[in-house]
Amino acid sequence: MTNLAEIILKRMKKISILLCALALVACGGHQATSPTLDEVFASRRSIRAYEAGKTISEAEVRELLTATQNAPSWANMQPSKYYVAIGEEKREAVLELIGGNKDRVINAPVFLVSTFETGKSGFFRGNPVDATGDLWGAYDNGLSNAYLILKARAMGFDTLIMGMRNADELRKLFEIPDNETILAVIALGYRAQDPNTPVHRPLDEIAKFY
C-alpha cells in the first residue's frame, strides 16, 4: 500500500507540473499577474508607431473609460467627456483631422476625443471662483486623461495624447456641443516596438523641500 501511495503521489506531482507548464505556455510564457503600479509607470510611453491588424473591443474601451471615472475633479464636477472612434468610418475620419500625427498613429484601432464641459470646474453658481476659471476644467481633464493612459498600459495597451487636431471639424464629426472644449485626441492601440527610455530631469530640479 505504501509503494502504491508513493507511485500515485509521484504521478500526481508530474501531472501538476505538466498543468503548470501548459498554463505558462498559454500565458505566453509569463505568469498571468497584473502589473504593479510602479511597473505601469515605468513601461508607459507616448507611442508613435502601432502594430497593424490588432483590434480593441468596445468592452475593453468601456473598462478603460470606467477607470477615468475614479479621477478627482473640482467639487466632483466630472467635466470630462470622451467621444470614441472605434468603427472604421469614424476612425478614418479622425485620421484626416490630426495633422502631422497621421502617419504615426495610422494603425491605432481606436481614437478618443477628449473634451471638458466649460463653466463647471472652478465655478460656483455660474461664476468663476478665482482667476483660473475654466483652466480648472482643463486641469480636471488632464487628470482624467492620466487615469486613461495608465489604465490602458495596465491592460496591455499603448497611447499617444495628441494636441494637433482640427477642433472645428472634430466638433462637427461627433456633434460635440459648443459648451465643451476639445483638448486632445488620444490614440489607443498596441506598440509596434519598444521606444527608447527618455531622459528625465533630476528630481531636485522639479521639487524643493523645506
Protein language model regions, located:
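N-terminal regions encompassing targeting/leader/pre-sequences
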Residues: 1, 24-27
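Positively charged n-region of N-terminal signal peptides that target proteins for export
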Residues: 2-15
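Sec-dependent N-terminal signal peptides
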Residues: 15-24
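Acidic, surface-exposed loops and disordered segments
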Residues: 8, 27-210
